[in-house]
C-alpha cells in the first residue's frame, strides 16, 4: 500500500465517523518559542489548553512534521528521520477511551478491501499505563486482545503531560511485532527493534500540578476530557510495503536510488557498522532524508539562512551535498535528486510540483553557494588542521569561529572534516565565541516589552468577557472597564501615578499585530479619571490589554469610560500600513511573484518591509518600485475591505503572510482589485491618495535570500525630500558647480584625484619602509642564538606593506637562525607579521606560534604558515608588549 493510499484511507475512515478533516498545518510552527511543527497535535494545542474554543468536537489530520534533534543519527538507524507525517484523530470533550481504542483496532486490522490497513491482529501488542485499568479492560474485554500481549508500563513510558501544570493523562501505545529475526521475544518492554511502535493514543483526563519531570501531583479530573492520537505514516508504510526501514518506502526510496546511481555506489541496506557498504548506505540514507525534508521546508516558505529555521534548512541541504561528496560526487547533485523527491511527494502534496520552479531555484542556489564555500573554506581548514596536527593540539575554537564567521563554513562540517583528519575541535571555545557574538547583537536589540498578566488569568478573563474591537469604524467608544491588572494580578482599582493594564468591554484601540504598531490615546471617566494609553497587546486572542498610566483620579472595575484613539497617530499609522501593501504590489510588478513578504513593521510615517529575494536591488529597480508606488498614490485607488471564508480568499489569490495563522473567516484588503489583494486584520486609509507621497530610503540584506526596504510616507516623505534637496544645494555650492546635474561628474573627478593622491602616498610609505630595511638588518639584535629584528613601523599603508618588509628583512638577515617580526597600524588596527628562515625553524621556531603570541597581547588573533604568518588585534598601545612577548618566546624556545 503506497503512502498516499495510507493517508487517504486514514482520513476517509475518520471522516465517515464524523471527524472534521483538517488540512496539514505548515511545518512552520505557530506556537511561541517553537520553530517547527513537531507532532500532529501541535496545531490543536490552543484547543487542548483552553486558549481557544474548537470549531468542531472531532477532528482528523495528516500533519507534516520536522524534528532535527537527532539529526546526527539520521541514516544510522531505521527510526531516525527529520521529516515525517503524523496521522491523528482528536476529540475535544466528545468521545473518550471507549470509542478511541476500538476505532484504532478496527482501522488497523480490517481488511484493505473493506477500508482498513489489514495488519495481522496476532502481531499487535499494546502498552498501557500501570494505573489505567480502564484502558486495560477495553483492550482485553472489548477488543479481545490476549492479556499476554498487553503490557503495563510506568509513568515514564505511558503518561503524557505538557511539562508544566495543565492537562495530563495516561496513554496507550500500539506496537507491531516484526518477528524473531529482529530481536528477542517478550514484547515492547524487552525489545524496541523487533516491536515497532506505530500508534500512540493519549487520554487527557487529569489536571497536573507543579513538579519536575514526572514527579508531580494529580490535582483532579479535567471538566472536558480530550483524545489526542498519533500514527507514524512512514512506520506503517514500512510495514505495509514490506521494507526494512522508512528510507526504503515509496516516498523516500527514489531519492536513495538516484543517489546510488549518481555516485556509482551500490546500496546494500546495511544497518550496522561493519556490515558491507554500511558507510555508503548511511550517506545515501542521509541524502534521501535531507533532500525530502528540504523540499518540504522550502515548499512551506522557509529559505536558507544563518539563524533559526533558515539555519536548519541550510544545514539539511549542506549535509546532503556533503554526503554526496563523500560518495564521490563533486558536481551539483540537487538538480538530479530534488525532482525525484518532488515526484515521490506530489501525490500527497501537489504544491511541491506546482511551486517547484521556486523551490528548485532556492535549493540549487544554496548548493552552488555551498560548493563555493567548500572550495574556499576547505583550503583554510586543511591548513588549520595541518598546523594543529604539527603542534599536536586540537583545532582551536578561534580557527573554527573564523571559518564560520568569515567564510560561512558551518561548524558541523568543520567537526566532520576535522574528525576525518584525526583532529578534535575545541568546540567549547567555539561556542563561547558564538555566544559572545550573539550577546553583542542582543545588546543592540530592542528591550522586551513589559510583562503582562499571567496567561491563565487572561484566559479566565477571555472566558468571562472578550474585547470587542470597534476601531475599524470609530475612534471614540463609550465602554466599560472589565478588569484592571497590576503586576499581572487582578485589582479592583488604580490611582493616579500607577502603571497598570486595563481590559475594556469594547475598545477602538488597535492591538499591535501583523506588523502594525498599537494605537495610543486616552481613557476618561465622568468622575475625572484620566488614563494615558501607551501600548495595546493581545496576549490571548480576542482579549485586548491596554497598558496605561493613571494620569489623574482613580479608575475602578465597572466604571463607564470613554476610550479615545489619538486620531493623528492612527491616520499616520494607517498610511504606513497601506504603504506596505503598495510596496508589496510594486515589488511583485518589478521582481515577480517570488518577492514574498517575510515580515513588516509600520508606525506613523514609517514602514519596513522584508521580502524574499536572492540579490540586492539595483538603482534602476529601486527607482521603478518607488515610481510604481507613487503612481498608485496619484491614481487614488479605493482601499476596499471584505470579510470572507479563507478558502474563498485563497481562490481569489489573496496573499497571506508567511508563518501567520488564519481562522476560517478572514479579512481581505484590496487596492485596485487584484493588483493588491492581501489577508490583513489591520487598519488602513480610505484611498491610496491619503498616503501623500512615498520615499524608499534604504535597501539591505536581512539574511541569505531575504531583503529589506524602508520607506517614509506622508509628511515624513516630504521632509525627507526637502532634506535631500538642501543637501544637494550645499554640495552644489561646495563643489562650485552651476547646477545639480554637474555634481556626479565633479564628484567623480574629485574622488579620482583623492585615489591618486592616496596611491602616491602609499608608494612613498612603501619606499620609506624598504629604505629602512637595510639599516634595520644592520641593527639586528641577538636573542640567544637567533638574529632578530623586532621593529614597530608605526603608521603603514596596508598589511601587504608590512609583509613585504618582513620578507625583505628575513632575506637580508642571512642563513643563520633569524626572525623578522614587524608591527604597524593600518586603519587604526594594530598588525603583526613574522617571518622566520629555515635555520630558525630547525631551532623550533614557528612563525604562526610567534604571531599568535603577539596577537593575543594585542587583543586579537592570527596564524599562517610555519615560515611566515600575520595577525592583528584591537589595542595598538600594546605593540611594545607584543614585541617583548615575541622576544621572550624566541629566548625560551631557541635559547
Swiss-Prot record:
Keyword set, alphabetical order: Aminoacyl-tRNA synthetase, ATP-binding, Cytoplasm, Ligase, Metal-binding, Nucleotide-binding, Protein biosynthesis, RNA-binding, tRNA-binding, Zinc
Reactions that this protein is recorded to catalyse: tRNA(Ala) + L-alanine + ATP = L-alanyl-tRNA(Ala) + AMP + diphosphate
Amino acids binding Zn(2+): 577, 581, 680, 684
Subcellular location field: Cytoplasm
Keyword Magnesium part of the UniProt annotation: no
Membership in a protein family: Belongs to the class-II aminoacyl-tRNA synthetase family.
Domain notes: Consists of three domains; the N-terminal catalytic domain, the editing domain and the C-terminal C-Ala domain. The editing domain removes incorrectly charged amino acids, while the C-Ala domain, along with tRNA(Ala), serves as a bridge to cooperatively bring together the editing and aminoacylation centers thus stimulating deacylation of misacylated tRNAs.
EC number: 6.1.1.7
GO molecular function, one term: ATP binding
Function: Catalyzes the attachment of alanine to tRNA(Ala) in a two-step reaction: alanine is first activated by ATP to form Ala-AMP and then transferred to the acceptor end of tRNA(Ala). Also edits incorrectly charged Ser-tRNA(Ala) and Gly-tRNA(Ala) via its editing domain.
GO annotation (BP), single: alanyl-tRNA aminoacylation
The protein's required cofactors: Zn(2+)
Protein name as catalogued: Alanine--tRNA ligase
Cofactor info, note text: Binds 1 zinc ion per subunit.
NCBIfam families: alaS (TIGR00344)
GO cellular component: cytosol
Superkingdom assignment: Bacteria
HAMAP family per the UniProt record, alphabetical: Ala_tRNA_synth_B
Gene: alaS
Amino acid at each position: 500500500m503506497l503512502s498516499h493510499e495510507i493517508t487517504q484511507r486514514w482520513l476517509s475512515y475518520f471522516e465517515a465517523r464524523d471527524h472534521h478533516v483538517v488540512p496539514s498545518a505548515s511545518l512552520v510552527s505557530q506556537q511561541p518559542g517553537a520553530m517547527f511543527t513537531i507532532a500532529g497535535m501541535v496545531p490543536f494545542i490552543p484547543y487542548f489548553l483552553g486558549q481557544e474554543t474548537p470549531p468542531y468536537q472531532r477532528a482528523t489530520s495528516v500533519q507534516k512534521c520536522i524534528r532535527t534533534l537527532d539529526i546526527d543519527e539520521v541514516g544510522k538507524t531505521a527510526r531516525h528521520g527529520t521529516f515525517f507525517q503524523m496521522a491523528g484523530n482528536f476529540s475535544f470533550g466528545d468521545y473518550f477511551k471507549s470509542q478511541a481504542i476500538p476505532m484504532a483496532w478496527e482501522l488497523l486490522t480490517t481488511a484493505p478491501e473493506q477500508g482498513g490497513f489489514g495488519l495481522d491482529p496476532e502481531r499487535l501488542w499494546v502498552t498501557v499505563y500501570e494505573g489505567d485499568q480502564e484502558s486495560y479492560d477495553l483492550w482485553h474485554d472489548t477488543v479481545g486482545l490476549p492479556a499476554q500481549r498487553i503490557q503495563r508500563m510506568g509513568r515514564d513510558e505511558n503518561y503524557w503531560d505538557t511539562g508544566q501544570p495543565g492537562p495530563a493523562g495516561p496513554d496507550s501505545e500500539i506496537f507491531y511485532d516484526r518477528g524473531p529475526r529482529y530481536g528477542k521475544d517478550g514484547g515492547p518492554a524487552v525489545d524496541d527493534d523487533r516491536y515497532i511502535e506505530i500508534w500512540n493514543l493519549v487520554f487527557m483526563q487529569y489536571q497536573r500540578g507543579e513538579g519536575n519531570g514526572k514527579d508531580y501531583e494529580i490535582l483532579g479530573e479535567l471538566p472536558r476530557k480530550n483524545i489526542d492520537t498519533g500514527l507514524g505514516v512512514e512506520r506503517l508504510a514500512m510495514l505495509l510495503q514490506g521494507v526494512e526501514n522508512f528510507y526504503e518506502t515509496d516516498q523516500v526510496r527514489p531519492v536513495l536510488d538516484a543517489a546510488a546511481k549518481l555516485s556509482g555506489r551500490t546500496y546494500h541496506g546495511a544497518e550496522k557498522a561493519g556490515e558491507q557498504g554500511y558507510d555508503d548506505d548511511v550517506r545515501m540514507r542521509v541524502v534521501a532524508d535531507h533532500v525530502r525534508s528540504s523540499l518540504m521546508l522550502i515548499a512551506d516558505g522557509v529559505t536558507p539562512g544563518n539563524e533559526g529555521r533558515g539555519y536548519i534548512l541550510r544545514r539539511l541541504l549542506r549535509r546532503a551535498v556533503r554526503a554526496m561528496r563523500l560518495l564521490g560526487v563533486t558536481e551539483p547533485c540537487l538538480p538530479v535528486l530534488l525532482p525525484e523527491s518532488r515526484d515521490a511527494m506530489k501525490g500527497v502534496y501537489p504544491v511541491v510540483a506546482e511551486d517547484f520552479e521556486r523551490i528548485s531555484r532556492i535549493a540549487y542556489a544554496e548548493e552552488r553557494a555551498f560548493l563555493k564555500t567548500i572550495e574556499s573554506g576547505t583550503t583554510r581548514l586543511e591548513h588549520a588542521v595541518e598546523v594543529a596536527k604539527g603542534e599536536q593540539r586540537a583545532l582551536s575554537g578561534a580557527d573554527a569561529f573564523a571559518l564560520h564567521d568569515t567564510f560561512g563554513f558551518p561548524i558541523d562540517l568543520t567537526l566532520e572534516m576535522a574528525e576525518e583528519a584525526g583532529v578534535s575541535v575545541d568546540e567549547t571555545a567555539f561556542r563561547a565565541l558564538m555566544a559572545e557574538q550573539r550577546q553583542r547583537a542582543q545588546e543592540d536589540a530592542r528591550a522586551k516589552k513589559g510583562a503582562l498578566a499571567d496567561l491563565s488569568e487572561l484566559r479566565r478573563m477571555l472566558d468571562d468577557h472578550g474585547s470587542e474591537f470597534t476601531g475599524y469604524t470609530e475612534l471614540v467608544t463609550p465602554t466599560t472597564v472589565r478588569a484592571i491588572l497590576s503586576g499581572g494580578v487582578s485589582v479592583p482599582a488604580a490611582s493616579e501615578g500607577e502603571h497598570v493594564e486595563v481590559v475594556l468591554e469594547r475598545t477602538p484601540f488597535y492591538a499591535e499585530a501583523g506588523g502594525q504598531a498599537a494605537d495610543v490615546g486616552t481613557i476618561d471617566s465622568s468622575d475625572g479619571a484620566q488614563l494615558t494609553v501607551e501600548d495595546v497587546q493581545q496576549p490571548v486572542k480576542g482579549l485586548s490589554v491596554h497598558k496605561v498610566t493613571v494620569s489623574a483620579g482613580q479608575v475602578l472595575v465597572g466604571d463607564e469610560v470613554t476610550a479615545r484613539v489619538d486620531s493623528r497617530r492612527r491616520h499616520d499609522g494607517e498610511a504606513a500600513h497601506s504603504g506596505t501593501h503598495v510596496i508589496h504590489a510594486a515589488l511583485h510588478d518589478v521582481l515577480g511573484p517570488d518577492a514574498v513578504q517575510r515580515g513588516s513593521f509600520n508606525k506613523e510615517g514609517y514602514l519596513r518591509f522584508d521580502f524574499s529575494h536572492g540579490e540586492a536591488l539595483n538603482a534602476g529597480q529601486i527607482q521603478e518600485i518607488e515610481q510604481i508606488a507613487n503612481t498608485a498614490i496619484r491614481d487614488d485607488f479605493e482601499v476596499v475591505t471584505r470579510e470572507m471564508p479563507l478558502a474563498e480568499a485563497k481562490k481569489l489569490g489573496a496573499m497571506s503572510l508567511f508563518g501567520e495563522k488564519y481562522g476560517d473567516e478572514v479579512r481581505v484588503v484590496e487596492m485596485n482589485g487584484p493588483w493588491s489583494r492581501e489577508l490583513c486584520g489591520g487598519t488602513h486609509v480610505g484611498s491610496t491618495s491619503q498616503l501623500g507621497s512615498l520615499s524608499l530610503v534604504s535597501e539591505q540584506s536581512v539574511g541569505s535570500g531575504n531583503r529589506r526596504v524602508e520607506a517614509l510616507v506622508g509628511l515624513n516623505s516630504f521632509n525627507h525630500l526637502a532634506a535631500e534637496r538642501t543637501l544637494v544645494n550645499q554640495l552644489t555650492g561646495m563643489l562650485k558647480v552651476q547646477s545639480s546635474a554637474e555634481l556626479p561628474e565633479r564628484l567623480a573627478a574629485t574622488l579620482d584625484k583623492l585615489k591618486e593622491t592616496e596611491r602616491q602616498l602609499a608608494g612613498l610609505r612603501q619606499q620609506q619602509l624598504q629604505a629602512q630595511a637595510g639599516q634595520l638588518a644592520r641593527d639586528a639584535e641577538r636573542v640567544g642564538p637567533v638574529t632578530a629584528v623586532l621593529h614597530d613601523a608605526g603608521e603603514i599603508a596596508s598589511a601587504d606593506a608590512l609583509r613585504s618588509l618582513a620578507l625583505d628583512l628575513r632575506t637580508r638577515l642571512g642563513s643563520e637562525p633569524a626572525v623578522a617580526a614587524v608591527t604597524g597600524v593600518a586603519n587604526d588596527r594594530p598588525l603583526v607579521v613574522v617571518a622566520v628562515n629555515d635555520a630558525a625553524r630547525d631551532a623550533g621556531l614557528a612563525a604562526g606560534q610567534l604571531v599568535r603570541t603577539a596577537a593575543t597581547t594585542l587583543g586579537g588573533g592570527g596564524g599562517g604558515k610555519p615560515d611566515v604568518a600575520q595577525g592583528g588585534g584591537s589595542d595598538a598601545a600594546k605593540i611594545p608588549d607584543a614585541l617583548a612577548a615575541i622576544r621572550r618566546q624566541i629566548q625560551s624556545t631557541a635559547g
